[in-house]
């Protein structure tokens, strides 16, 4: 499709494999000894190693701008129908499954502005004041399209179930529940 041969592709390495060394002139300029350079890993895989997600069947949920469910596996597990991704982990002989929601904590900033609140802590406080007797409001956090489980860059965010009984507090709660 792109007229590139395998010879034109870079070498592949395990994340922990040494691929070179810091250039001597850079090491000298920085006052360092020779430093090995390793292949490394993607942001989620490196973060997973940092919190100890290194063995098969371990999993974590990471909420930042996006939301990531990360599960360690011993091999490649393809789930294309669900848009669950399978990647090499940053560690040798490990893989991981990853589901990504493109808008997670970023929705909290957006909702705080939408409801006229000053910041995310104020949004959380408002959510805690939501009327428990009110009918539920549902929020789909597709403010940047979506990747998992529906790989659709055109997906849009939605509030539904709104009535006259709902206000900023109920919207705040819906956003927190929709992201979580």
Predicted features along the sequence, with ranges:
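Active-site core segments that coordinate phosphate-bearing ligands/cofactors
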Residues: 1-3, 17-180
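Conserved phosphate-donor
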Residues: 12
